[in-house]
Amino acid sequence: MDYKQIVTAALSDALAGQLTRDEIASKLERPKTSDKGDMAFPTFTLAKLLHQAPQQIAQDLAEKLDKTSFEKVEVVGPYLNFFFDKGAYSAETLQTVLTAGADYGQNDDGQGGNVPIDMSSPNIAKPMSMGHLRSTVIGNSIAEILTKNGYHPIKDNHLGDWGTQFGKLITAYKLWGNEADVKADPINKLVEYYVRFHKEDVDKPELDDTAREWFRKLENGDEEAHELWQWFRDASLQEFNDVYEKLGVTFDTFNGEAFYNDKLEEVVQILKDKNLLVESQGAQVVDLSKYNLNPALILKSDGASLYITRDIATALYRDRTYHPAKNLYVVGSEQTYYFKQLKAVLQEMGVPSADDLEHIPFGLITVDGKKLSTRSGRIILLAKVLDDSVKLAAEEINEKNPDLANKDEVAQQVGVGAIVFGDLKNERTNNIDFVLADQLKFEGETGPYVQYSHARAESILRKAGKVTITTDGNQISDPEAWDTIKTLADFPAMVKMACDEFEPSVIAKYAIRLAKTFNKYYAHSKILTEDAELPARLALVKAVSTVLKESLRLLGVQAPDEM
């Protein structure tokens, strides 16, 4: 029973076509308190159209409305406040949730369309820092949300395993490296060399020339350069996979930049065939002036390829392999201009899926307000943050519930979940200043708070034993239950909104809202009292548990049954 559609239809009939149904639906509001109804329609925008005072319009509409679907409709100033039939609405909502289970909110809007998601994409020979968290968890959550909306996401970890940085790294290793040191501690040593290179090249510009020469050798298949590159790549991947395992994130492909090296010639040839390449100071560029963009540099004057050259090859490969319905790049906001250029080049080339390319930008993670940087050596390792979070979660759980049977497993779920949820509750374009202790609080808008709310619901159900659950909403008389039921009914709309906006925070904020309404209900109601309403109250608790768990799953967070 979609009351938004019912309200929209009733108003549409009363307005006799003066507003479209979409216009009406967009104006509907959820009152902040239940005494003002369950849905409200403001009449301000109709005042100019009808040349009447909003209060008079509200009165006239109230008289014309078919009110049979509502408990009552009240006029309060310029607002029409709709009160739903609580019994019917509650029964249908609970029945829908409990029948569907984890599939509640599922839709087939995507019709199975493929959606490659370029995500995570760390650079080889650099550790995964907190700066890599956002693309990884945002991309993973978007993939889950897309699946819930009927799409087929392909999670593509487009590793940064090629580029001029490898010339710098090989140069640094040849100058200052030691094989035994690297084998003993690969990533930390490689980072040490990389940071040293950038410190020393300030006074020694010839280092950049050497680095460029080593990268040219790598591109030309030089045996020593390739062996060093492969070694750096293998060592890095092992560390990356350890972090992904902690996060519970998997990928469908790890096709890094190097995978596309043999596809670059075709890119250049297509650009030439379409007369898109023009020479500029010895380099080859694509003129994008008609898009009000700077030229896209495709080949340097020495013939070396650039990042965009490989990204064009990647987009062509994905287009031919997946025939995507959407083509997503979960990359930081600082790359917005670059993705405008990439999309424009693909459109000029006539790539079929070019129009469906969407950059999904996100803000920075800072610590003490400062940006993280591998070059400057300002790195906070993601693996260490996750381990520290699990350790703090274990201490908190041991204090709150020392007899918990599976404390280590729950600490892992809570500690990692706190970091993931702490990121995803923020609108993705916002910057985040990271404070670990804030993420781990069991009260407030945190992952542990939502997880604890789910565990509380599961605890109630265990204590209830084998009581038969009923979805007869007429039997729930608690006023706090009504807010919880309305929140449960919102979930399918939140799933759609999160998909339309590629915004996991929609789900995270919804989970917080549901947890809050449930905990308010829990505080005001004696749920396990053995009376006629017990089966209906348990149905509500079961529905809350189901939807909280599914909300957390969409975010890539686990929901422990006990905490």
Curated annotation (Swiss-Prot):
Keywords: Aminoacyl-tRNA synthetase, ATP-binding, Cytoplasm, Ligase, Nucleotide-binding, Protein biosynthesis. GO terms for biological process: arginyl-tRNA aminoacylation. Gene3D superfamilies: Arginyl tRNA synthetase N-terminal domain (3.30.1360.70), HUPs (3.40.50.620), Isoleucyl-tRNA Synthetase, Domain 1 (1.10.730.10). One of its GO terms (molecular function) is arginine-tRNA ligase activity. It catalyses: tRNA(Arg) + L-arginine + ATP = L-arginyl-tRNA(Arg) + AMP + diphosphate. Its main location: cytoplasm. One of its GO terms (cellular component) is cytoplasm. It is an enzyme of class 6 (ligase). Its EC number is 6.1.1.19. A motif ('HIGH' region) lies at residues 122-132. The keyword Nucleotide-binding applies. Signal peptide: none annotated. Belongs to the class-I aminoacyl-tRNA synthetase family. This is Arginine--tRNA ligase. It comes from Levilactobacillus brevis (strain ATCC 367 / BCRC 12310 / CIP 105137 / JCM 1170 / LMG 11437 / NCIMB 947 / NCTC 947) (Lactobacillus brevis). The gene is argS.
